A protein has these predicted regions:
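Alpha-helix boundary/N-cap detector
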Residues: 99-102
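Conserved motor-region signature of P-loop NTPase helicases/translocases
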Residues: 1-70, 74-81, 95, 109, ...
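Amphipathic, charged-and-aliphatic alpha-helical interface segments
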Residues: 83-90
């Protein structure tokens, strides 16, 4: 009898791997990929990276929407549609500030606290505090392949802590530089 680990799919390039990976996962077949991945593009890293951007500057609509819709906060797409219906003009942050009461009041309080922490804590302590207060590390651990996702998030936090020696703005600049230079590459080399 054959086992899953008796088979190997070799591809000429990495570009098509996502299609194969999705098809194999859909069929319930475990997939091992030895690829270099952009950590910043991982679906379980993007919300946390967006949170850092929003703490640094909340007037960024796309990161703010990503944070509001993430497992860190209890909002849905319907909440954002309702908010936009009430405040169709201006930025999303302006709508949250002026049209989102009382539904978004807890978010605004949390964001104010996170921004205060960002001004007073070193980045490594800030990251630990954010993970603890949002429960995001636990949420990521509950995903399929949670152990790998947790490991990725911890790797991202270690990278951000070293990049953020000058504070949160340093982390944001480092993320932007990594994006311009092709991403934050990490060898995932595990179950995917």
């Amino acid at each position: 009898p054959c086992r899953y680990d008796d088979f190997c799919i070799l591809l000429r390039g990495r570009g098509d791997f996502a299609v194969y990976e999705a098809a194999l996962r859909t069929a319930g077949i475990p997939v091992f990929a030895d690829t270099a991945a952009d950590l910043l593009d991982e679906p379980h890293i993007r919300p946390f990276a967006a949170l850092l951007r929003v703490i640094d500057n909340p007037a960024q609509d796309i990161p703010l929407a990503a944070v509001l819709l993430s497992p860190m906060f209890p909002y849905t797409a319907d909440d954002l549609v309702t908010l936009r219906g009430a405040c169709p003009e201006g930025s999303l942050y302006g709508a949250v500030l002026y049209g989102g009461q009382p539904r978004f009041a807890p978010f605004l309080e949390t964001l104010a606290e996170f921004r205060r922490l960002a001004r007073t804590l070193p980045v490594d302590a800030l990251l630990e505090e954010l993970l603890a207060r949002t429960g995001y590390l636990a949420a990521v651990g509950a995903l399929p392949e949670g152990a790998r996702c947790r490991e990725d998030l911890q790797s991202f936090c270690a990278w951000a802590a070293s990049a953020g020696r000058t504070g949160l703005p340093g982390v944001i600049r480092a993320m932007d530089a990594a994006r311009q230079n092709g991403g934050l590459t990490q060898n995932t080399g595990g179950q995917t």
